[in-house]
Amino acid sequence: MLGGVMSSGRAKPGTALAGVMWSIVIPVKRLSLAKTRLCAALAASTRDDLLTHSPPSAVRPAAEDQLPANGRIALAMAIDTVCAAQACASVACVVVVTDDRLAADTLSTLGARVVPDAPDDGLNAALRYGAGLAAAHRPDAGVVALSADLAALRPGELTDALEQAAGHARAFVSDAQGTGTTLLSALTGTDLDPRFGAESARVHRRSGAHPLEGGWPSLRRDLDTPADLTVAARLGLGRATAGQLALLAPDLVSCAC
């Protein structure tokens, strides 16, 4: 379990280790509580009638009938993130930590291993729990915490980052602003030690995690604001997120084309 024995050795800095496999841990909030600020900002700047009311049931699955717009966007982003991670040859499994039933049902059908947020004590506790389960399931694989809102994520960029991460006991990728963290990795036998929150890039670096260097625009672009969505749309949104935004904020997507 990753919360246990620490690695006695260090990977040679800057050296990508061939054949390293990874378990990806993705935390997903309860959909009704996710992306509320993003949706509020979109409502103020685009078509607030669609962002504050559910679209006709004919254009979405019946299970989503009562899900607010913010929840539909959050679920779509999680779907695209999971699909991108699963497309990487070095990813052994994807573990989703969530207490949301719809998210669990949807993401499990994509092949993710879904576990409840048993600690129920915030993001870092959920990630520690998921990392422990992932390590128990695949003790031969390193563990990666990955943001659930990387809707434009390209598998090639994630693969490249994971290859670099294989050269460091712990490593991280900062977000586009350079202050947050979108990816945190730990090799087998090393404590993941997630410290997400305010200024997490600085905090992770101070904790000993190595900052990974690479352009990786889709890996660094988590989606918290309409401006983030516009940039992600230019990069190319995943199918699920693009479909939701075509319904909820078509003007934003069309402006990015």
What feature does the model see in each segment?
Residues P155-Q177:
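Conserved donor-nucleotide/metal-binding helix-loop-beta segment in metal-dependent transferases, i.e.
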Residues E199, V203-C257:
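Conserved alpha/beta core of the MobA/IspD/sugar-nucleotide pyrophosphorylase nucleotidyltransferase superfamily
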Residues M1-G19, A43-A69, A136-P139:
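Intrinsically disordered, low-complexity terminal tails and inter-domain linkers enriched
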